[in-house]
């Protein structure tokens, strides 16, 4: 029996791998939304807020996650996770798993609770990732302290802020900064966590451009045959066709790690 989970930010193309696993007879729980997220999510959301209390914001774009790796995991947290995953964990299926983007926000304790399961880290170019809204755009909703978007713009990118003279443009710019901060934070929390025994990184773009080769990697990793799903090539590189800012320099480290081009 194998248990699988996906680690990846919302709007990161994670529905593609969830739908792939479902098409491959992997039980992903029920009910699911159209993105393949296990519902209801409230217990997971509360677990995110609980873990966030033990993350120390050091100011600017720095957080200290170190105590998450050694402190006792609160019973309240494990109870919330077991509540959320009840149908998956008690299912008799040979292969099963779950997907919800908020798993990334609790990754350090999920790894400690489930050290032997198979993790798929699903990443997407943040320049595409920040173009559309997701529930995790404002990390304060999940208890995470991070810089104020407008203050950050004023100090680091004053020209961008000054150019946003229309209210709607300014609002969209602020949300893109929040999404970029969310991507950056989630990259940081995963990077700071000791990796489990079973860990693979897959880029959404590689899945779209060469599904066959990417599925071959995943099949070798998971040890099961995987079905194909329909993908749309236009989901890659949308930032080239989008108006407004899609890159902030604090994203550079994460982008380089995953092999994404840095704009000049």
Where are these regions (language model features)?
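PAPS-dependent sulfotransferase catalytic core
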Residues: 1-80, 234-238
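Short catalytic/ligand-binding loop motif for oxyanion handling, primarily in non-cytosolic enzymes
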Residues: 15-18, 104-107, 127-132, 208-212
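Glycine-rich phosphate-binding loop used to anchor ATP phosphates in small-molecule kinases
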Residues: 76-107
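Short, hinge-like loop/turn segments at secondary-structure boundaries
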Residues: 47-49, 136-140, 218-220
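Short His-Asn-centered micro-motif
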Residues: 7-8, 98-103, 123-124, 204
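PAPS-dependent sulfotransferases, especially Golgi type II membrane carbohydrate sulfotransferases
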Residues: 1-5, 10, 22, 134, ...
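Conserved phosphate-donor/acceptor-positioning beta-strand/loop module used by diverse small-molecule
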Residues: 99-100, 110-135
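Short aromatic-enriched loop/helix-cap "lid" or pocket-rim segments at secondary-structure transitions
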Residues: 110, 131-136, 141-145, 213-215
């Amino acid at each position: 029996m194998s248990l699988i989970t996906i680690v990846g930010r919302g709007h990161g193309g994670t529905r593609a791998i969830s739908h792939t696993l479902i098409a491959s007879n992997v039980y992903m729980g029920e009910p699911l939304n159209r993105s393949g997220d296990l519902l209801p999510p409230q217990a997971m959301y509360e677990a995110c807020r609980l873990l966030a209390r033990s993350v120390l914001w050091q100011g600017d774009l720095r957080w200290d996650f170190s105590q998450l790796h050694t402190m006792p995991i609160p019973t309240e947290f494990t109870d919330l996770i077991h509540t959320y995953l009840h149908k998956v964990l008690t299912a008799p299926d040979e292969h099963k798993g779950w997907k919800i983007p908020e798993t990334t926000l609790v990754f350090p304790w999920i790894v400690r609770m489930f050290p032997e399961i198979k993790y798929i880290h699903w990443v997407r170019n943040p320049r595409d990732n920040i173009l559309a809204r997701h529930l995790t755009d404002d990390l304060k909703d999940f208890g995470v302290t991070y810089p104020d978007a407008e203050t950050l713009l004023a100090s680091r990118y004053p020209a961008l802020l000054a150019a946003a003279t229309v209210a709607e443009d300014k609002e969209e710019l602020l949300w893109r900064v929040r999404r970029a901060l969310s991507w950056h934070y989630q990259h940081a929390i995963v990077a700071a966590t000791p990796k489990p025994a079973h860990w693979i990184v897959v880029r959404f773009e590689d899945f779209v451009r060469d599904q066959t080769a990417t599925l071959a990697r995943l099949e070798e990793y998971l040890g099961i045959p995987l079905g194909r799903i329909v993908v749309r090539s236009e989901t890659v590189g949308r930032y080239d066709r989008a108006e407004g800012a899609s890159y902030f320099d604090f994203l550079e480290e994460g982008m380089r790690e995953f092999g994404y081009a840095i704009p000049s």
